């Protein structure tokens, strides 16, 4: 059963855009920081650092820089998922609002708190002289819950896209980096924090 009209229209997908903007800013910062992470080692000349440790140090520096760039890309994907999802949810909500208004203009009034999308005919809101039509009532009774379902599906699709992006972020940390620096823990915590924020968006329509 789809969420009611009142539930759907209480959602505020614009909040996802605000979150996405913050993630895009984080991506930009990571893009800038990525070369700085490895360059202090990679920029040393062979004369400045020789010995058996140089090769592994270079490899690790390259790994850190490459990982940061990959993380930046994944955060970009996460932000894009949130932005696209917000647009899709907003579009679905607008479609439901417009269909409800159109039905009302013909005299078919939606019970906006009903998850069954009950429609009743009110001659006072219908065009002058209009009478109840079983065909029109059926059309609105069928279309409106379909729009409610589409709105719910837009939220589900957005949730799945965001969870997929979060999973990618959590899965790309090299073991050497995670073990030595605790970066994996921080990345996982960031992912969980974002998921909690998004969860509140779903539950509270915030």
Language-model features, listed with the residues they occupy:
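Membrane-active amphipathic alpha-helices enriched in small hydrophobic residues
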Residues: 197-206
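N-terminal secretion-targeting helices of virulence/extracellular proteins
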Residues: 1-178, 182-193, 202
